[in-house]
Amino acid sequence: MLKGNYVNWGSSGQAHALRNALNAMYRLDNTEEHVKNYRPQILVLTGNLSERNHLLNFATSITKDSCLLISAEVIVSDNPDSLISTVTDEEAKCTAWLAKNKYRAFFHAVSSASLSDGVRQLLQISGLGKLKPNILLLGFKNNWKTSKLDDIAEYVTTIGLAFDADFGVCVFRCNSENVTDSENVDECKPLMDQANQEEQRQTNNTELKTSINDCQTFTIEMVEDEFKSENEPSNNAKPKKTICQNFSRKNKTFKKCNFYLKKDLFRQKVKHATIDVYWLFDDGGLTLLLPYLLQLPKSYLEGAKLRVFTIANNKELEHQETSMATLLSKFRVGYTEVTAIPNITKKPDQKSLDEFQESISPFLGTAALSESELLAERSRTWRHLRTREFMLANSSDASLIVITMPIPRRRVCSDLLYMIWLDLLTRGMPPVLLVRGNQRSVLTFYT
């Protein structure tokens, strides 16, 4: 008997699934919120999934398939209305990609004339009822030094918009160079490429000279495993993922190499991991909650040791450490060490000042950064430099650093200076997660 093609005729089970989900949403919308029921619902700006899905891996370690996770992309175009059908098609394609790669997440894309306007749309419309994100996670802008000032302003504006929308904000800097993008590029093609192609068809311009499908050769150097266990001898360490030798398809050629794909980063568990938390300001407890969740099962840092650092005056070091230890015990957050940072406001070392001067030197004398602003913000700059000194001295061996993020103050601090601060707090470190809550309490003393 011949077997025909699969045809979905529908079923009563599918109809009941939709009705049950709808009823559950109604019940949730009428449920009174309480700090004990708080869940981190994350909107992560991954952009193209095949390029930045390591952000999705990291977010999954927090949500653990039990909280809302939305992967989002903003397609910047001069004519965003013309891309509505393209966005719909790509949402379906990327949703299938998420299911194939076993991510419990949704994908959402919008087309907009600018990044900040697109993020504003996402912050307003993502989710439904009370099942909507309350944290915005985005990657660090690594190319800020070579970017236009308008692009830096767009990035900082994005952070400010999230605070205005009463979101918590997380900025993640991987600081890893031994990862690459080479897999699944055809399955989830960048939406920006399609936006460019759509614009070119409308303006009758010439075809794009380069695209993902036109790549001729892709070569990657051999790298070492940065997540290697200390007990394993380095000469026997081998990458757990490799690309097959002399693989070619269409116009692509992948040479023999050993490296880590971004799809695997933050999916493999780290042995003997340590999370360092720099709780510098009270933001409702989000800076403590996220590393606590990263300690739990189903995380790449499962079972990690937690070291907490806070600030104090020299005369109050012991008292502050004792108070913090008591507070963590009340919150039922396990920790291995509590340390108070002394003299956070004193003048930094000359090496740190020289490093800061090197960062600002290309912009001095321009309208983007004035001497008067540097003088007015000197105390905050020194504070960030002193924090960096302490992080370099105490957390260079950590698996992850979680630190309270400074808030951008509009009309007081320029976007460029704020970007320099973020860079100084994260450059040359292990992976760093900058966190700032929305002052909503996410931890409670009571059971």
Regions found by a protein language model. Give the residues of each.
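Membrane-embedded alpha-helical bundles that form conduits across membranes
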Residues: 1-447
